Structures are given as structure tokens and as C-alpha cells.
């Protein structure tokens, strides 16, 4: 594997709307981010990923972009963005942005021109098709529910959208459209952006025949991702994208890639891959329901553990993946992956350790470093997320009561990760002096940055130790390039693995069970690098782990 500048970096995702509001309008902004750069740097962060800050009607929280060259005024100005770039550079941090190029907003100039002239140049920037016998051109269900086809008033045509109807899909078959996108991407890279997180990118390749699929739900429709899984050729688009943009700037790119074919991993993240890396969603996909959140399966610990470790072994043949516990589209990891008895500061530290020391690029999501958790709301109107509202309806239609449907939303809603960051115990958790756009979590007086700054044993200060160990000069090589070797897999409650190079061996071992466990050490221990129980004595023959204990040991090689 060819060494790259980003291989040993740690990333932090900011969801700007919920990070910090500087002007009291209830919406986080660029000025708020600038004011917290020292806080982010102290966490050991090298790369900051900003969720969309482009001009947008915010139907889908900025993933519906109406102008790729403008900053949403809710977040600030281009001058403030340039200041953010400059201030991050002073601190030796890199900024990457979300790149949403499968679709745009229906308010984008291109789509407005297409609607005005359905036979004109801009109509070919999108997918317009005639209906079939008064019905949509095909039976695809969008990711947010309902048909992927929206009728164009006054015509017999429909336009295609895999997400909300306000997010028409862009026609990547059109070279003019592709060049427009490449020009925009290069404009941002010229400004000094270090790269992009690329949203929903595998969806850009369509089967232009748009064939019907066997219905998979009572609505008579089929999930649109079935087309994605059955069409070939996305790699040609991705190579063209890379060569015309990212490659010229040695940019760091991380793809959001679902529905990839099993044999394509090397094409996506190898030395000559389409992207620098892609997110590893293997653990998150385990809880995908057949019809929605309401029938999400229970995932037992061993399945979760073995899935992650199997993915590690598979990926290291090709390159590095990006590892996450949570992001803006997922519920909080502490609530999702830990049993109730482990949803404590000790358990939170354990979960963070086993994730951040995996092989790959760690991505920490805002609030994860203080152990923010899911929130319980008893009214669907408290939710803002378009996907949650759709999933609530699906659950009710499937026969769940209002209480049961809300319980499902409480577990899986994207708004769990979008509640404002809890900075202190003051009103609105110190996020805003106004009315927050989304309710602040009710536990903000117990879980907040200010309280944890003062507590040397807090989750926040533990995370700082964790990132420092990963980046320490004497361990950087093993944590960056060392192989992941699973250990103690016969245990019902232990997740353990070695990180190994030719000269070093590090053991990461965690007990997710309620009871203490003991196991025989396979190698002599040289040093305790980290413990969420503050242990410093090297174990000799036996490794004893209390409930929710994690320990990181340097072993003889």
C-alpha cells in the first residue's frame, strides 16, 4: 500500500446546524465552528468534515442543494468560510465538505430551466420519462418512501428522484452535466479544501430502461436500491470523476457507499481506488429491517463483533476503510450498540476504544466524545427528520400503535444524532441564546462539555488519551498500518484483537458482558497503554476484565 498523507489522520464530523449557534437564531453556524477549533484540535483531530453548508431549501437538511457555489445564509458567508479554512490551516487541520452530486434541489437553476423547457438542454441534466398507462414509468420506491417518480404538471412526463421529490437525480450519462460538476468540485479544491465526503455516490449509475422489480411491500412497489444492485458501470463514472478532480489535488475522499458488489472493494479503496477510503457500515447494516425500522432485527453481541472483525480482515487486503460509531444519519452508538447496563461513562469509553483503535481512519461524530445518547420524544411532531416521519407512517400502517411507532423512532431516528451539542449546563445546553431549531436533549445538565473538561476521568478526557495513543510516535505505525488479528473469539462477551506489524503487537480487549471474565494471555505484556479502569499494572498469565472494562496492552512480539 502506497503511503498517503491522510493514512494516519483522525477525523471529526460536524453537523453545522447543531454544533454551535453564535448569533442567537437557533441554528449552528460557521462562526460557532471557528470559535471551537481549539476544542477540536485538543481532541486530536486532523480532518474536519462539514455536513452540507451550501445554499439549500433544507427539505433534507442541506442535502438538497440549490447553489453549489454559495454558502447557506443560515450558516454564514463565504468570507467566514474562508476564515474557517485559514484558521484550521493555522492549527494544522484540514477541512473537507460534503459532496452531494447524485441529486440537487428542485430549486436549483438547472432544474427550474428543465421544467420551463422539458425538451431543452437542461432537461437532459435529469431523468424525464413518459408514464405508462397513466402510471409512473416504473415501480420504484424512494429511500424516503413513496414513488421515485414525480409527475410534471401539465405534461405526460415524470422526473426521477431516489430521495425526496424535492431532490431530482442528476443524469450522469450527460457529459455536459458531468463537466459542470467537475468545474464546481475543482473550484472548491482551488480554495484550499482538502477533499470531500461523497454522499450516496453509488446511486449515480441508473439502468436507463428503469425495469420494474418484484414488489417487496404492500404498496406494490420495490426498493429503488434493487436497480442500483443490478446495474453495472458505476466504476467508469467514478474513475472519470477522480481523474478530472480529486487526483489533480491529492485530495482526501471518503465515499458513502452502500449496495457495492462484494468483489468491488479493491476498486473502491485500493492504491488506485475510486476513493481514498469508504465508510464501513457493516455493523450498522445488521439492523436494517426488511420493510423499515419497525421490523429491524435484534443483533446479538457475537454477530456484531464478528461482523466488524471479519470486515477488518477483508478490507486490509486492499487499503483502509473509515470507521464510525455514529454519524448524522444514524442513532447514537451508545444507545444502539451497548446494553442498558453498559450505557455509562465506563461503557462509552469501552465502545470508543474498540472502534478508534481498529485499522482504518477513525471518524468521531460531534457529541460522541462526551457520550451523547438517543432522546425519547412522545410526539411525532417533535421530530424534524423527513426519514423519521416516513418511518413512523410505515410503522403505523404495519399495525403498530402510536406508542410503539414512537418507540421505534426513538431507537432509530436520525434526529438522535442531530440534537444540539451539549456545551454546558446553562439554558439550551449553551448551544444557543435563542430557540434551538431542534429540541436539546433532556440530559444536558448531566452530559456536557464543560462538566467533562473539569473531570479528569470523563469520557471527553478519555477520548483525548485515546487519540493521543493512536498518534503517539512510538505507536503511530502499528495503529496506522498494522494488521488486525482477531483474538479470543470463542468468548461470548469479549471483543479483542491485536494490531500487529513485524516489530510490534498491541492487544485491545474489552468485556461487553455483565459479569467479569478471565482468559489466559497469549503473549507476555510489556506495558499498559490505556485502561478505562485506570489500571497500570501489567497482567502476567491471566487477563481479567470486569464488566465493561477495556484495556490496551503492548505485548511481546
Region annotations inferred by a language model:
Residues 1-55, 82, 86-88, 361-364, ...:
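Carbohydrate-interacting/catalytic domains
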Residues 2-186, 190, 203-263, 270, ...:
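Acidic/aromatic-lined carbohydrate-recognition and catalytic surfaces
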Residues 36, 87, 184-187, 191, ...:
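Generic, well-ordered alpha-helical scaffold segments in large soluble proteins
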Residues 48, 196-198:
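Hydrophobic residues within beta-strands of alpha/beta enzymes
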Residues 94, 98, 195, 252, ...:
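Hydrophobic "anchor" residues on beta-strands that sit immediately upstream
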Residues 106-139, 238, 242-420, 425:
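Conserved alpha/beta catalytic core and glycan-binding cleft of carbohydrate-active enzymes
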Residues 168-178, 225-228, 333-346, 407-408, ...:
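Active-site rim elements
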Residues 217-220, 286-288, 329-334, 439-447:
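Short acidic (Asp/Glu) and glycine-rich catalytic loops that position anionic groups and cofactors
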Amino acid at each position: 500500500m502506497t503511503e498517503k498523507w491522510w493514512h494516519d489522520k483522525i477525523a471529526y464530523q460536524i453537523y453545522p446546524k447543531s454544533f454551535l449557534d453564535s448569533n442567537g437564531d437557533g441554528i449552528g453556524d460557521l462562526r460557532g465552528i471557528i470559535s471551537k477549533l481549539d476544542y477540536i484540535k485538543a481532541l486530536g483531530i486532523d480532518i474536519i468534515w462539514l455536513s452540507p453548508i451550501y445554499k439549500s431549501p433544507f427539505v433534507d437538511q442541506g442535502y438538497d442543494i440549490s447553489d453549489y457555489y454559495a454558502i447557506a445564509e443560515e450558516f454564514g458567508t463565504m468570507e467566514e468560510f474562508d476564515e474557517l479554512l485559514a484558521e484550521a490551516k493555522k492549527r494544522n487541520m484540514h477541512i473537507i465538505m460534503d459532496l452531494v452530486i447524485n441529486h440537487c434541489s428542485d430549486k436549483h437553476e438547472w432544474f427550474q430551466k428543465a421544467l420551463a423547457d422539458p425538451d431543452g438542454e437542461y432537461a437532459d441534466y435529469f431523468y424525464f420519462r413518459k408514464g405508462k398507462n397513466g402510471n409512473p414509468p416504473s415501480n420504484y420506491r424512494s429511500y424516503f418512501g413513496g414513488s421515485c417518480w414525480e409527475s410534471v404538471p401539465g405534461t405526460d412526463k415524470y422526473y426521477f428522484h431516489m430521495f425526496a421529490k424535492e431532490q431530482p437525480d442528476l443524469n450522469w450519462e450527460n457529459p455536459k452535466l458531468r463537466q459542470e460538476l467537475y468545474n464546481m468540485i475543482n473550484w472548491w479544491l482551488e480554495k484550499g479544501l482538502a477533499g470531500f465526503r461523497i454522499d450516496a455516490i453509488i446511486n449515480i449509475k441508473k439502468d436507463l430502461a428503469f425495469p420494474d422489480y418484484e414488489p417487496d411491500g404492500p404498496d406494490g412497489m420495490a426498493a429503488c436500491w434493487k436497480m442500483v444492485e443490478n446495474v453495472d458501470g458505476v466504476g467508469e463514472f467514478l474513475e472519470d470523476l477522480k481523474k478530472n478532480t480529486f487526483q489533480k489535488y491529492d485530495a482526501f475522499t471518503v465515499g458513502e457507499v452502500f449496495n457495492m458488489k462484494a468483489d468491488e472493494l479493491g476498486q473502491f479503496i485500493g492504491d488506485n481506488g475510486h476513493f481514498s477510503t469508504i465508510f464501513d457500515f457493516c455493523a450498522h447494516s445488521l439492523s436494517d429491517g426488511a420493510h423499515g425500522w419497525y421490523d429491524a432485527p435484534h443483533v446479538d453481541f457475537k454477530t456484531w463483533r464478528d461482523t466488524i472483525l471479519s470486515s477488518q480482515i477483508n478490507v486490509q487486503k486492499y487499503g483502509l476503510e473509515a470507521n464510525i460509531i455514529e454519524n448524522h444519519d444514524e442513532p447514537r452508538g451508545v444507545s444502539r450498540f451497548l446494553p442498558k447496563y453498559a450505557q455509562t461513562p465506563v461503557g462509552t469509553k469501552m465502545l470508543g476504544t474498540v472502534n478508534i483503535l481498529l485499522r482504518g481512519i477513525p471518524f468521531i461524530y460531534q457529541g460522541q466524545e462526551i457520550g451523547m445518547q438517543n432522546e425519547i420524544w412522545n410526539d411525532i411532531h417533535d421530530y424534524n427528520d423527513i426519514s423519521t416521519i416516513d418511518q413512523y407512517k410505515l410503522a403505523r400502517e404495519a399495525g403498530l400503535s402510536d406508542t410503539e411507532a414512537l418507540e421505534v423512532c426513538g431507537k432509530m431516528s436520525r434526529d438522535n444524532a442531530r440534537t444540539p451539542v451539549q456545551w454546558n449546563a446553562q439554558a439550551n445546553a449553551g448551544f444557543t441564546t435563542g430557540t434551538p431549531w431542534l429540541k436539546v436533549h433532556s440530559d444536558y445538565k448531566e452530559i456536557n462539555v464543560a462538566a467533562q473538561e473539569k473531570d479528569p476521568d470523563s469520557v471527553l478526557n478519555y477520548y483525548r488519551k485515546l487519540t493521543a495513543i493512536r498518534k503517539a510516535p512510538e505507536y503511530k505505525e502499528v495503529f496506522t498500518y498494522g494488521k488486525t488479528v482477531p483474538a479470543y473469539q470463542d468468548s461470548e462477551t469479549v471483543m479483542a484483537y491485536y494490531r500487529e506489524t513485524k516489530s510490534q503487537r498491541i492487544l485491545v480487549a474489552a468485556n461487553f458482558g455483565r459479569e467479569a471474565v478471565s482468559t489466559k494471555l497469549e503473549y507476555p505484556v510489556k506495558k499498559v497503554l490505556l485502561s478505562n479502569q485506570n489500571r497500570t499494572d501489567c497482567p502476567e498469565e491471566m487477563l481479567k476484565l470486569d464488566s465493561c472494562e477495556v484495556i490496551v496492552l503492548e505485548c511481546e512480539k
